[in-house]
Amino acid sequence: MLHPARPKEKLPVVYTSRAKCRDCYRCVRVCPVQAIRMKDGQAEVVADLCIACGTCITVCPQHAKAYRTDYGKVLQMLEEGEKPALSLAPSFVVYYSEWEQKRLPSALRMLGFSFISETAIGAWHTSMATLEHIEQSPDQSHICTACPAAVSFVMHKAPALASALVGVVSPMIAHGRLLKTAQPARKVVFAGPCVAKKDEAQWDSNAGIIDAVLTFEELDELFRLKNIHIDQCEESAFNEVVPGVARLFPLEGGLLRTAGLSTDLLHDHIVAVSGYREVKSALDALADDPAQTDRKSVV
């Protein structure tokens, strides 16, 4: 993924609800980039350091850590008569039940989305571009990731390895570009499970591509506010057909599968990792081999 260039006035993605914070320090202990500091007895998120991985949100027993929501922004778009396109992350098949998946396109159209397509279409383009990049530089080590939190982690914790990041945009951005190219004036909204996508959308390099980022929970909140019940919607299809293999992209090693590369654990030159501890371990291994005598692609 392309390196993040954040705007000077970066909107915080993760923040502390001060009234709920109870001095337990759990978020401070688990933050992989030490972006949480104690101030006046409160665990405060340092926006410039935060990679929006969401770990602190998960561990906080008081629910004092939260993420910035964009559903109000999308609701305003819809109420002003906008007919945005929706890029839906392929992991919706995990969040929604099988019968809900069949009715989801109709529910989204009832909300006001004019074009509904899976982000997996962008995943195919990202995978092919990544494969081309690797083939053009076979003698170098590569870090291949579409995860904005992982990219930010490299920039914060292993800046010496930043040059190994494959300069390819994520599926969200690739898909957003395709949708904007088709209709430049149309708003594009992304929906998925990842909080870090809210950060990625505001990087300078991605300006004007994604107009709002929703989590699946925010999507459900829009359905609630508009009194739309998925179980009462008709079955319907998305506006575009997805290359089947591209739906594997969110899985560990999914980029490899989509690009047609080996995911065999015995493959000497490809390491597929997930979770910041595994990512850190893989980065440490690369950093310990500055001459790249053991060239690897970390995915």
Regions found by a protein language model. Give the residues of each.
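A broadly conserved sequence feature marking short terminus-proximal activation segments
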Residues: 1-25, 254-275
